[in-house]
């Protein structure tokens, strides 16, 4: 089962035929599929939630009310979290707005929260914590905390094509915890703390496609906003998307073990894959917005 609860897609990948001809999708089919996926990745904030605030009043996340109540009732974390005026205040005794002090507070609480089972994935990677109103980075925190606290993440997607318009798709490892066995973009991943999107996309292309040269990144970026409930909590992500044209004599090959296979398919094939649920929902919409 995939992260968004869709069963059986790993088996469906094995049954998909890359050799057959696929019909050209109509503009109506494209519009309907875009709308369908958009409804999945962008939800209204649920009613039974509370804002997550710093002691200085910075709004940084969103959490289900029942989880916030459970967390503040847990004696192990009574000094780190407090419910005040229908909001979850983190580190209520932290009276400074110093980013280093707030980062250290996140570091102190992250491992105990993980060990207590409040979130599952420990990534050992720091991401920027943003004030949702100003957009300013106010601290750094362990990546695993972000869905649990409903904090904003930023990511990059490299939509790779050949000069003839054929599109690269990468088969996600079946051992990945999120969307295993689905076909993704040429490269995609989180923007780490203090990293630009340009640096992040070059790093991801090197790690996932094995390319350090032999490609050209397009000049324009688009942003896909993802807001939805996930098993870990609330997913708030701004995904920055760029087009990448790969030279004909460059041959992408995964090097970090997170991709099992990289193929080059026609746009008609790609549409059929998206329509049949063989791509992650967010990646499917990235493809549709970028190529159709």
Where is each model-derived feature located?
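N-terminal leader/linker segments that precede catalytic domains of diphosphate-processing enzymes
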Residues: 2-182, 190-203, 211-251, 267-278, ...
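Catalytic-pocket segment enriched in acidic/His residues
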Residues: 207
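Short glycine-enriched loop/turn motifs at secondary-structure junctions
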Residues: 253-258
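Short aromatic/basic micro-patch
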Residues: 264
């Amino acid at each position: 089962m995939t992260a968004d609860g869709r069963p059986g897609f790993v088996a469906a990948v094995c049954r998909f035929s890359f050799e057959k001809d696929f019909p050209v999708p109509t503009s109506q089919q494209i519009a309907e599929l875009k709308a369908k996926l958009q409804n999945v990745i962008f939800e209204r904030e649920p009613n039974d939630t509370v804002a997550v605030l710093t002691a200085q009043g910075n709004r940084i996340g969103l959490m289900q009310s029942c989880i916030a109540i459970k967390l503040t009732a847990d004696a192990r974390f009574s000094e780190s979290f407090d419910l005040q005026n229908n909001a979850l205040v983190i580190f209520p005794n932290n009276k400074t707005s110093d980013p280093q002090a707030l980062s250290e507070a996140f570091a102190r609480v992250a491992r105990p929260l993980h060990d207590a089972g409040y979130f599952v994935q420990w990534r050992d990677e720091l991401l920027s914590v943003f004030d949702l109103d100003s957009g300013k980075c106010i601290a750094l925190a362990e990546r695993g905390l972000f869905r649990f606290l409903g904090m904003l993440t930023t990511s990059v997607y490299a939509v790779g094509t050949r000069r003839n318009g054929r599109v690269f798709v990468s088969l996600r490892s079946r051992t990945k915890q999120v969307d295993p066995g689905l076909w993704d973009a040429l490269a995609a991943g989180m923007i780490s703390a203090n990293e630009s999107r340009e640096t992040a996309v070059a790093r991801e292309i090197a790690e996932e496609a094995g390319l350090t040269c032999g490609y050209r990144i397009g000049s324009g970026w688009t942003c896909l906003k993802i807001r939805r409930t996930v098993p870990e909590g609330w997913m708030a992500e701004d995904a920055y998307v760029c087009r990448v044209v790969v030279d004909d004599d460059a041959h992408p090959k995964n090097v970090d073990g997170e991709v099992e296979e990289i193929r080059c398919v026609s746009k008609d094939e790609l549409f059929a894959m998206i329509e049949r649920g063989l791509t992650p929902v967010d990646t499917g919409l990235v493809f549709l917005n970028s190529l159709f």
